[in-house]
């Protein structure tokens, strides 16, 4: 027999849905039978399949262990690396500095050692996450970053935080800032690039157009050049729209591709500066700027967080021209 106390993440769901998640190997036919014969009870009493569970309810299941989730020792996330760069953490969210080379979610090449796998392991070992107890929610990422790009990723610890942050992302109340190194220098020190983008799903590439064409979506990329050295420009970028490969494709369209970008840039140009196999792009800063109610996350309003280390700052200023780690990142001048 196993007992479960209904927590915040399981509140208001149907009894049968909860049982499916608590005992995923229990056949549907037995589920109905066990509820009917009182082998599954809510607060010590027989309940209907459609019963909506409330916070604090106790669900008792007098069923064999074979119907429950696999044992702790076989959880895949326990095989993930323990290494996490945590920028900020509280009871609702985590902000992680994802390093280049780490996947956010599993793919065909890497199933276990991913950012979400590491987060699950970390919270499990802290006692904040248990697959047996939190049956309707697991730690979830609010945003994702490509494997070859590093930077800040937001993780939600509970369903309410995930709901709020997903809405805030949609409403553009989370501002994400990137650092990148461009080959060349934009015509203006700062500005907003406005164009249109079409994604080729099969090739996983995008194309940029000056004017709207069928199936295209508007893109807006705000930028400011911080410094230019030896034909390379360290640039801060804010995405005003969030499209696939937007930063990489947009700057390449204007003749200033990202250093190291083999997909939208020029390998010949890249080789002039070294044998880099990844683009110089990092999501280094995040600002919460709520214009509507943020519920349990209201305390985050107007707060800004930065990643501690951007790997290519030192590369950009290589040779001791500028001490990049202590340099104040502000533009010399601004043009409109």
Where are these regions (language model features)?
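Short gly/pro-enriched beta-turn/loop segments at secondary-structure junctions
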Residues: 147-149, 173-177, 192, 216-220, ...
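Pseudouridine synthases involved in rRNA/tRNA modification
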Residues: 1-33, 82-84, 213-220, 230-234, ...
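Short, conserved beta-turn/loop elements at beta-strand boundaries and strand-helix junctions
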Residues: 124, 187-188, 202, 228-231, ...
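Short aromatic-glycine motifs in intrinsically disordered, low-complexity regions
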Residues: 204-214
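Hydrophobic residues embedded in beta-strands of well-ordered beta-sheets
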Residues: 93-94, 206, 233
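Short, surface-exposed secondary-structure edge patches
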Residues: 48-52, 236, 278
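RNA pseudouridine synthases
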Residues: 1-201, 306, 311-317, 328-332, ...
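Long C-terminal interaction/binding lobes of large macromolecular proteins
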Residues: 223
